[in-house]
């Protein structure tokens, strides 16, 4: 819904929505000249070939790069001669991605862009996003594949039931939840389990344990550990999936 409102495909119920200092609804035609879009529910012309479809989409946008298109076709290994109706879900997705990535614009608006792609094609997509970032292009990526967002995003917005519940860099969001600690010491590790700031305690043997700790308690832990002879200390920051799930569980 948010993406559709930004593109002027839906009218907002209240508030202000603008892109490039232009009203998303009133100035949508002007905004579209600066935006490439891959929808989550990609619908194409069944009787056109893949090549014809890409050419048409690029022509409609008006700022396509033929050389870049050919490069992307080769990278994504797409047969342009086949009709769209014969394409798999993944190949249909490639059509949309090639058409969007082959145009030069200021904002690339991608809604579930890797749906249907195999891991190799996902890797190629990620390389293309890295290229756009180097060119200082803006990319808005909507995805339920949190590992993908974690690899690609500079800033993350978590939306739940239509409202923004968290927003910031991944590093900023990690401060909101717990890190996982793997600890091995030469002396007995058990006394640590009784500390009030230690959670999810799992003892491997008398010298090793795994547990979690809030960001604000990290200094307390390090102070306590000065009394131990440490053989191994591994601190794993939370993944985006862990951040999301913990926030969801707290809300429930």
Give names to the regions the model predicted.
Residues 15-26, 30-31:
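Conserved ABC transporter NBD signature motif
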Residues 108-112:
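Catalytic Walker B motif of ABC-type/P-loop ATPase nucleotide-binding domains
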Residues 7:
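Helix-to-loop junction immediately C-terminal to a conserved catalytic motif
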Residues 119-121:
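Helix N-cap at the start of a conserved alpha-helix in ABC-type nucleotide-binding domains
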Residues 125-212:
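ABC transporter nucleotide-binding domain
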Residues 179-251:
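Short, charged/small-residue-rich alpha-helical element at the C-terminal edge
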């Amino acid at each position: 819904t948010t993406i559709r409102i930004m593109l002027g495909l839906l009218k907002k119920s209240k508030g202000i929505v603008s892109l490039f200092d232009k009203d998303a609804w009133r100035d949508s035609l002007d905004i579209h000249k600066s935006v490439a879009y891959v929808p989550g529910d990609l619908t194409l012309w069944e009787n056109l070939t893949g090549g014809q479809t890409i050419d048409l989409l690029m022509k409609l946008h008006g700022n396509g790069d033929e050389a870049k298109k050919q490069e992307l076709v080769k990278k994504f290994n797409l047969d342009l001669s086949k009709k769209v109706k014969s394409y798999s879900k993944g190949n249909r997705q490639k059509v949309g991605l090639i058409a969007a990535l082959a145009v030069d614009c200021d904002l690339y608006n991608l809604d579930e862009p890797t749906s249907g792609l195999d891991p190799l094609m996902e890797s190629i997509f990620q390389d293309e996003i890295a290229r756009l970032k180097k060119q200082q292009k803006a990319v808005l990526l909507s995805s339920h594949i949190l590992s993908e967002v974690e690899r690609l995003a500079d800033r993350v917005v978590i939306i739940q039931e239509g409202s923004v519940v968290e927003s910031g860099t991944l590093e900023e969001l990690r401060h909101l939840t717990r890190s996982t600690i793997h600890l091995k010491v030469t002396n007995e590790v058990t006394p640590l389990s009784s500390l009030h700031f230690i959670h999810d305690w799992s003892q491997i043997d008398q010298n090793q344990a795994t547990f979690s700790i809030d960001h604000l308690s990290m200094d307390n832990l390090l102070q306590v550990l000065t009394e131990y002879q440490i053989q191994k200390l591994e601190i794993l920051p939370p993944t985006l999936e862990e951040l999301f799930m913990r926030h969801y569980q707290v809300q429930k």
